[in-house]
Amino acid sequence: MVQSRGFSLSSVRNGTEGNTMSQHTSQPAADVPVDVADENRYDIAAIEAKWLPRWEEANIFAPLDDGSKERRYVCDMFPYPSGDLHMGHAEAFVMGDVVGRYWKLKGFDVLHPVGWDSFGLPAENAAIKRNAHPAEWTYANIETQAASFKRYAIGVDWSRRLQTSDPEYYRWTQWLFLRFYERGLAYRKNSPVNWCPKDLTVLANEQVINGACERCGTPVTKKNLNQWYFKITDYADRLLDDMAQLEGHWPERVLAMQRNWIGRSQGAHVDFVIDGMSDAETGEAKKVTVFTTRPDTLYGATFFAVAVDAALADELVTEEQRAELSAYQERVKHLSDIERQESDREKTGVFLGRYAINPIDGEMLPIWAADYVLADYGTGAIMAVPAHDQRDLDFARAFDLPVRQVLDTGAENPAETGTAAIGDGVLVNSGELDGLAKAEAIPAAISLLSKIGTGEATTNYRLRDWLLSRQRFWGAPVPIIHCAECGEVPVPDDQLPVRLPENLRGEQLAPKGTSPLASVADWVNVDCPKCGGAATRDTDTIDTFVDSSWYYLRYTSPEYTDGPFDPAAATRWMGVDQYVGGVEHAILHLLYSRFFVKVLNDLGLLEAKEPFKALLNQGQVLNGGKAMSKSLGNGVDLSQQLDRFGVDAVRLTMVFASPPEDDVDWADVSPSGSAKFLARAWRLAQDVTSEIGVDPATGDRALRSVTHRTLSEAADLIDAHKFNVVVAKTMELVNITRKSIDSGCGPADPAVREAVEAVAVILSLFAPYTAEDIWAELGHQDFVARASWPTVDDSLLVQSTITAVVQVQGKVRDRLEVPTDITEDQLRELALASEIVQKTLDGRGIRTVIVRAPKLVNIVPA
């Protein structure tokens, strides 16, 4: 049985993406499990109904943008409108909201915008299923989500709202494509691409997860197509080197993932002459270049391998071996890159009938086509050194190829053990390199290759150019026209946007392997802008990751009509001070956005060189230890949670359950506990009797000290994103304030008003409806979101008293305010004199008393 987590300090532990939500309901909370009698009519439904329309009318989160305050920009990864908001959204968006509200209270001019990533395949599939146009489903969902955003009290500037499927947005997506095209960064080429046989569209390398389509899970195949690419590889070094600016501000896990994806490695290009073959263009001896990080092991190369799906394999194969190669290619074409590189998989290959000549010793190396070699790594060909590479060794043993050890690592002979000798060692069987260690041998080998003109030092990258083309409808059309006379012709800027036709719907959008746009003759057939002759539009649409690579720039000036964004506005706001979103976007979206900003910087459109100064990855919302899903039947409906417990209780639970980066298991939290705590906090304001504006300096010093310590610690904790600890400390302040009202300094003491105002300000970050009502009850005329974070009096931070916990047999029975310098004997005496302790003991004797002055006493009865 899973035990619900209550709201004790012990429950503060180390919080996203949930799943599933039914259609939005705008009903207020109807079943809040709060003891209404005890908490004096805390009615969260009425409170929500009171404040939501007032907030909407005031648009209190629109920035001034007049230079009167220092600017801060907080941005959430915008949602895809696939339905209503779900539990994952609830956790993710509250994190950015906490940051934005806090910065506003601290006096910054805060930009916190909202929008939708509204192009994409789900809308197209929904339109096919519903016999509709994708826009109908998309914009209906956007309106539903927008209503939920407002109800959920996310403090954003609604005047900056955008959707990437709006023509006035994708006009600028197309405009940016053309600027990349002019710079040589957008180009088209024929190449093997990842192909999803279910969605019938191509996928970027980053969209293939463990050999399957990231969206539908179908195993991905390879297909030769003429496709559009962005030349992101031109920026590989800058993308890698500029990560130094992000150290300490981005999660190290994300930086490591990007470093690995870019995959920079130092080594050498080595030229191998193909025996008996001439270059078709030059007539000279045919050469094939390979990349290796270990040129020092050249003497150990015993065969040459080419990727089975590389064009090079078809070029090198002899006519006698061509049929065998074709049959092999057919057998392996359905294997993913991941499967092909699995270490425990049987190695397969075909001899191509030719030999490559080792440039360092003239040895003839048989050339094989192999599926463990990838076409898009290096040049698609490798020199195989089986003694010192396990996959090469497995292949050599499978086809009875020689194994020659050239590195003495102290390990047994790989030819006998079947285990490659890897790592550092001393070169052997390597001619003039004998006796050299790896660090000396690598540059020596490169020097030798350079002298004989067959190699040079180089850098290789795992990163490949970004595949942009999609053979689907619901995306921005590629703004290129194809003319038989002029070739590729960019659509003139004054003809942008190239709008999507509005007459396609339902089955007309069904995937056929070519874009549905190709079927609309009056859209496809146009005059060439250059020569006026008959021409056709490009029928592919642009990868939706392009839309999301620059939306945060559009937020800075969404009404700007002279470009994708106003350069002056972007200069004022960029880069984003706090970006919030899931770690699943570490490579795709985040890497692409970094690439875009660097190109725009080079184009002179943007001063920023990085899009996001700081990144916060929230965790996942689980249920019963598993991700929520329809198949598991463990989904939690967000709207039902909001109706039952109230918005504030759900928000507070999300924040209190764990630090933002950790997962939240909804089966193990207590939104009802959150609601009860909020009712207690709300009740405080009903009991304050001092007038607004009273000088708190005349109030109870002990309570004031707790209030100011809470404010001081909360500020540091919020900066560190330890929101759950802030909530815990606010709970302590509420409890201490209640005790002060009931049995301490009393409700009229100015320190009580100060404490309750502090509670309202802090709670406005997490539970804005309740905080707003507390603030108004205290007599304030303006919204609490427009208040200021209270100034901390440092003189009150020096503790003269502390709360000592008194336990009886390990259970807390009383709390005592005691001097910080109290002795153990004094604390023991006070604890034993407590009326609550005496009542608990009920005449029993005492076995022992454990004292840890000034914080703890534990009494063990006899």
Swiss-Prot record:
Residues reported to bind ATP: 630
Native source species: Renibacterium salmoninarum (strain ATCC 33209 / DSM 20767 / JCM 11484 / NBRC 15589 / NCIMB 2235)
Name of the protein described by the UniProt record: Leucine--tRNA ligase
Region described as Disordered: spans on this chain: 1-31
Reactions this protein catalyses: tRNA(Leu) + L-leucine + ATP = L-leucyl-tRNA(Leu) + AMP + diphosphate
Organism placement in taxonomy: Bacteria, Bacillati, Actinomycetota, Actinomycetes, Micrococcales
Family affiliation: Belongs to the class-I aminoacyl-tRNA synthetase family.
Pfam families: Anticodon_1, tRNA-synt_1, tRNA-synt_1_2, tRNA-synt_1g
InterPro entries referenced in this protein's UniProt entry, alphabetically: aa-tRNA-synth_I_CS, aa-tRNA-synth_Ia, Leu-tRNA-ligase, Leu_tRNA-synth_edit, M/V/L/I-tRNA-synth_anticd-bd, Methionyl/Leucyl_tRNA_Synth, Rossmann-like_a/b/a_fold, tRNAsynth_Ia_anticodon-bd
